[in-house]
A protein has these predicted regions:
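Alpha-helical membrane segments of multi-pass proteins
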Residues: 1-181
Length: 181
């Protein structure tokens, strides 16, 4: 499931990139802080064991989980694209930290949190706890990758803009430009 959720977040990024120049619906500017909080709330809420187990037992809740994770991630990636350098980096850092914390929580839990996976893990040759720890590691390490890649992309854009204006590329000027935005 953790890979599935990461794929939803990655798909939301792809759709947000495609929607950049689309119709007026996608031109709404939401603050990065709001979209970061919304995405964090959706991910963390759906990982509360009672909600997660309920979603796996009920098709309507399951699709609600998928839609809210995708929609909040889509809004987050749209906001990141439209934000200034500092806002985008802050949002990416916030997204990365919350993903890492959720992954670490799953990895270091002392007992399985999700009944469904604890019961199905033995068919894969894993204990319920080992399955959860593996999922936590995937979320912790793999889940932080899109945010890190986004940060590198933003830094590259900022440096390209700076080079286009003829400013020096030393680190002090880069920091001044980032603070000005």
């Amino acid at each position: 499931r953790s890979i599935h959720h990461l794929l939803l977040i990655a798909a939301a990024l792809a759709f947000a990139l495609a929607a950049r120049s689309s119709g007026p619906l996608f031109r709404v500017h939401l603050p990065v802080s709001l979209t970061t909080l919304a995405m964090t709330a959706a991910l963390w809420a759906w990982h509360v064991p009672a909600l997660y187990n309920a979603a796996l037992a009920n098709m309507a809740l399951y699709w609600g989980m998928q839609i809210t994770i995708f929609a909040t991630s889509f809004a987050f990636w749209l906001a990141i694209q439209r934000a200034g350098v500092m806002g985008a980096v802050g949002g990416l850092l916030g997204g990365m930290v919350q993903m890492g914390c959720l992954g670490a929580l799953l990895t270091f839990a002392s007992q399985p949190l999700y009944v469904t996976h604890a019961l199905s893990a033995p068919s894969w040759g894993l204990t319920g706890l080992a399955d959860q720890q593996l999922a936590g590691l995937v979320m912790w390490v793999g889940g932080m990758a899109p945010f890190a890649i986004g940060g590198l992309w933003i830094a590259r854009r900022a440096w390209q803009r700076q080079n286009a204006t003829g400013n020096s590329t030393n680190s002090i000027n880069v920091l001044r430009e980032l603070q000005a935005k």
